[in-house]
Amino acid sequence: MFSKQDQIQGYDDALLSAMNAEEQRQEDHIELIASENYTSKRVMQAQGSGLTNKYAEGYPGKRYYGGCEHVDKVEQLAIERAKQLFGADYANVQPHSGSQANAAVYLALLQAGDTVLGMSLAHGGHLTHGAKVSFSGKLYNAVQYGIDTTTGLIDYDEVERIAVECQPKMIIAGFSAYSKTLDFPRFREIADKVGAYLFVDMAHVAGLVAAGLYPNPLPYADVVTTTTHKTLRGPRGGLILAKANEELEKKFNSAVFPGGQGGPLMHVIAAKAVCFKEAMEPGFKAYQQQVIDNAQAMAQVFIDRGFDVVSGGTDNHLFLVSLIRQGLTGKDADAALGRAHITVNKNSVPNDPQSPFVTSGLRIGTPAVTTRGFKVTQCVELAGWICDILDNLGDADVEANVASQVAALCADFPVYR
């Protein structure tokens, strides 16, 4: 029998030590990975609740197990809040991740071998948009579009040309490393021209969309997916949204369960409900605007210091820095910044001569530091420190100096106050 007083401490100190070390790392390091953020204690409370004990295969009111009357209410709250937040008619809150939400869309709308058109991973797309190593590239005939390497922007006429040539059944608009605004009406126009479904993956910008600071794809897309972390600041999880279409709704529901998943994670769905409510609070829009302001200010510092920022800047929460001209690799830059307690991720850039394990770029994002309370002043200072390290790569004295300044800044802006 379990006791309410059971604790990890004293029972599994090896695990607790690793957990505590990670929490301390989050406090002591500046987090600039664009897909990472900090959740509220309310989100964590939901995830650590007794809801983790409940199996609930099926959907509210249509479960395969008994005892679901309360978790039905939890899931329905999450569904209604998601619909309200994004102006959707349909929401499925059960996907365990963004990739599983995307897989459900493929399963619902396509047959194996069908042609899909998505953004190349090397140009800012995502693994699930047709990369050869992903199910999306293994099970489907994946054709890729990219950016114009001169402008750093998507060439929609070129996307249209490719679509006319390959006649995809589905076109994917979305990214993991593209810093400009997607033209959803133009994507809709292209999809209609070739009779394709338009699938928008807004995982990176969902928080900006919810705040009204980035175009909402719902009026244009046949289906939209997102993660619930990143700019939404919720738990790790996925979400599917759509306009009213009973036939497609049934397909999406069946593709999630039983098509790709079994029982939903009710404790995570409760945490999603919390984060959707938080995203409807008045301060959420101000937070998202600060995310954009901080990213734009940081990108400008890199430009002023002589670095190439892909696409020439950013409209959202992230930007890519190309290190090709400096002759540096993303791997070495990532490691040097890590020694100074600044966490970024190496990232491929267009025409990258290096492998994806080495790369010639860095992806930098501001959601986490903005949650921490950083404003433009702190982000400009931070960008300068990063440039100092890149200009003196491998210089231990420079790294140590930056690390001491990072420590002071982190002390001034704790993750949880």
Curated annotation (Swiss-Prot):
Protein name: Serine hydroxymethyltransferase 2
Functional note: Catalyzes the reversible interconversion of serine and glycine with tetrahydrofolate (THF) serving as the one-carbon carrier. This reaction serves as the major source of one-carbon groups required for the biosynthesis of purines, thymidylate, methionine, and other important biomolecules. Also exhibits THF-independent aldolase activity toward beta-hydroxyamino acids, producing glycine and aldehydes, via a retro-aldol mechanism.
Alphabetical list of InterPro entries matching this protein: PyrdxlP-dep_Trfase (IPR015424), PyrdxlP-dep_Trfase_major (IPR015421), PyrdxlP-dep_Trfase_small (IPR015422), Ser_HO-MeTrfase (IPR001085), Ser_HO-MeTrfase-like (IPR049943), Ser_HO-MeTrfase_PLP_BS (IPR019798), SHMT-like_dom (IPR039429)
Gene Ontology BP term (one): glycine biosynthetic process from serine
A Pfam family annotated for this UniProt entry: SHMT
Subunit structure: Homodimer.
Gene3D superfamilies xref list: Aspartate Aminotransferase, domain 1, Type I PLP-dependent aspartate aminotransferase-like (Major domain)
Enzyme class: transferase
PANTHER family: SERINE HYDROXYMETHYLTRANSFERASE
